[in-house]
C-alpha cells in the first residue's frame, strides 16, 4: 500500500523539538530575522540541577537590559536638549538671546580683569609696607645713634639732671597700624588647619581603638557562650541546664 503522503518517502522521521523550533512563533520567516541561542535537545531548562534553573541569571540579565535602555534614553534626551539650546531659538527673539549672551561674556571678562587688578594692588600695598618698615627701621637706628652721641656730649655738663624721655617716633601711625601680609595670613591659616587635622586624626584613632577593643570583648563573650552551649549530653542532645544558667545570668545582668 502506498504511503499517505507521496513526498514523505525519502524524508527521515520528524522530530518534535526540531519541528517546533522551525515553525513556532510565526514560522521560518520570523526565526530567520533574529538569532536564536543553541540549546541541546536533551536540555529542558537553563542551568542544571546542581546550579539551579538559571532564574537568578535571567533576572540579572533582564535588569541589566532595562538599565542599558534607560541609559540610552537619557543619553538621547541630553543630546536633543543640547541641540535645542544651541540651534532652535525663535527667529523673532534670536537677536535678543545672542545679545544677552554677549553681555554675560563681557561681564565675566570685566570681573576677571577686576580680580587681576585687585591682586596687583594687594602686591603693591605689600611692597609699600615693606619699604615703609625698612625706612622706619633705618630712621629709628639713625635717631638712636644721634641721641646717644648728644647724650655723651651733654652728660658731663648736666650729669645731675634726669634723662629726658625718648621721642615719640615709636608711636607713629605706621608702627601702630602694621598690616599683616597675605603670606602671614596664609601661614596662620595653614597652621590652624594643620592643628585641626591633627586633632581630628587623634580623635579618629582613639575611636578606632575603642571600637576594636569593644569588638574584641564582644567576640570573646560570644566564643565563651558558644563553648558553653556546644556541650552535649552523653546521648548527643543539647544540655538544657547550661542554657538555663546562661538565661539566668542574662536576667540578673539586666536587673543590675
Curated annotation (Swiss-Prot):
Stretches with biased composition (Polar residues): 136-185
Lineage start: Eukaryota, Metazoa, Chordata, Craniata, Vertebrata
Family: Belongs to the TAP26 family.
Name listed for the protein in its UniProt record: Thyroid transcription factor 1-associated protein 26 homolog
Region (Disordered): 1-35, 72-190
Pfam family, any one: rRNA_processing
PANTHER family: THYROID TRANSCRIPTION FACTOR 1-ASSOCIATED PROTEIN 26
Cysteines joined through disulfide linkages: none
InterPro entries xrefs: Fyv7/TAP26 (IPR013730)
Transmembrane spans: none
Gene from which the chain derives: ccdc59
Basic and acidic residues: bias regions: 89-104
